Amino acid sequence: MKAVLQRVKHSSVSVEGKLINEINEGLNVLIGFEKDDNDEKLKKMAKKIVSLRIFGERFEKSVADIKGEILLIPNFTIPAITKKGTRPNFQNSMQPSTAKEFYDKMVKELNNYIPTKAGVFGAEMQVEITNNGPVTIILEV
């Protein structure tokens, strides 16, 4: 499981020109699930996302500490293998039906900690962010 976290002042997701969700200060998280992911990894990733200290002048606060929000965007391209050639290889990406289940579980798990809004699994989305910093972190569990 891999995630790209971006510290944001604002983030929104739209589908076909229609606003689906938006947040103010918090994290925009692009998440990709891999074939070998399981519930244990999911819980570990959720805890790490919520607890990672990337806010404040000296990175002393987490998104939970600042009472921020999360916008969670599903993205099957995150686990792409890019070491060879010029075309990404998606053989490590989880099958869509299973990945949707994992995505729904992740939204629920994150909501146990802080307000989390979701993108639309399987849709062509337009994601807008106002990156704060910029601070962008890649997590892998």
From Swiss-Prot:
The keyword Secreted does not apply. Belongs to the DTD family. Its EC number is 3.1.1.96. Homodimer. A Gly-cisPro motif from one monomer fits into the active site of the other monomer to allow specific chiral rejection of L-amino acids. This is D-aminoacyl-tRNA deacylase. GO terms for biological process: D-amino acid catabolic process. It comes from Nautilia profundicola (strain ATCC BAA-1463 / DSM 18972 / AmH). It is found in: Cytoplasm. InterPro entries: Daa-tRNA_deacyls_DTD, DTD-like_sf. GO terms for cellular component: cytoplasm. An aminoacyl-tRNA editing enzyme that deacylates mischarged D-aminoacyl-tRNAs. Also deacylates mischarged glycyl-tRNA(Ala), protecting cells against glycine mischarging by AlaRS. Acts via tRNA-based rather than protein-based catalysis; rejects L-amino acids rather than detecting D-amino acids in the active site. By recycling D-aminoacyl-tRNA to D-amino acids and free tRNA molecules, this enzyme counteracts the toxicity associated with the formation of D-aminoacyl-tRNA entities in vivo and helps enforce protein L-homochirality. Keywords: Cytoplasm, Hydrolase, RNA-binding, tRNA-binding. The keyword Hydrolase applies. A motif (Gly-cisPro motif, important for rejection of L-amino acids) lies at residues 133-134. It catalyses: glycyl-tRNA(Ala) + H2O = tRNA(Ala) + glycine + H(+); a D-aminoacyl-tRNA + H2O = a tRNA + a D-alpha-amino acid + H(+). GO terms for molecular function: D-tyrosyl-tRNA(Tyr) deacylase activity; Gly-tRNA(Ala) deacylase activity; Ser(Gly)-tRNA(Ala) hydrolase activity; tRNA binding.
